[in-house]
Amino acid sequence: GMMHRSTTNPSIATGDGVAMASRAGADIKDMEFIQFHPTALYSSSVKPFLITEALRGHGAVLMTMEEHSKWRMSGGGNPSSESFMLNYSTKGSLDTRDVVARAIDTEMKRIGAMNVLLVTEHLDKDELLHSFPTIAERLDDEGIELGKDPIPVTPAAHYMVGGVSVDEFGRAMSDGRPMQGLYAIGEVARTGLHGANRLASNSLLEAVVYSGRASRKIIGDWRSGELSSLESGLPRWRSEDLSQLVENIPLIPDLDA
């Protein structure tokens, strides 16, 4: 996640787990599949946090700054018909997150903007505060008033779908076969369950189901004595040519080129 200018990932998300597994000989798959959340708060002072998609479901509308200014000057009303999203989807701001994230990114590049706006001022403010108290509180910390001020948002790298290829027990795979003693659980793993986009509320599946399967497999192998020869069967750490590695330029400077 830290390869990207805008990400919801913590600062420790630098790909070390995938790199270590790769050097141990594990298969790495689908690294090009990254889910971007369409509406993270854009701010130069704080780490991006998610503006829930439920806010768009409640009636919030995506607009460029120019569209928002013209809409205000015209007297307000429902801003949906003025949104750039209609150029990308007949569903406007209510389309799926992959469509919306791609549309926002395309529009930002087209006009040279760092963000677009999520407009809520046409909605009932009291109802918004009741339905989205946490969002309102976080926005208030940034001096943004929900139901009054437009919210600056930008797509943010949210979830790495690819990673260390694993089997149904979370065992890392090497040349299509499970490796002894190496398991990958959570976002570092590529389970193959998601396709090219993350399934919603995947923590239960990735963190709980797979960790449960992995732990039961490890306990079973220990009880049967299969772990006794583990050390001698581990592959050598692949470290050739490390002295010749050159630090890659991250995506952040590339975006400024």
What is the predicted function of each stretch?
Residues G1-T8:
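Flavin (primarily FAD) binding-site architecture
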Residues N9-T14, S43, L199-A200, E206:
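Short, glycine/acidic-rich beta->alpha junctions
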Residues M20, A26-P152, V208, K217-G220:
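An anion/pyrophosphate-binding glycine-rich loop and adjacent beta-alpha core
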Residues M63-L94, I104-E107, Y159, S165-A184, ...:
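Glycine- and aromatic-enriched mobile tails/lids
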Residues N9-S22, I28:
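Thiamine diphosphate
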Residues G1, A21, L182-A184:
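Short hydrophobic core segments
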Residues G1, F33-Y42, V46, V188-R190, ...:
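Acidic, glycine-rich active-site loops and adjacent beta-strand->loop/helix elements
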Residues G57-H58, M160-G162:
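Short loop/turn microsegments at loop-to-beta-strand junctions
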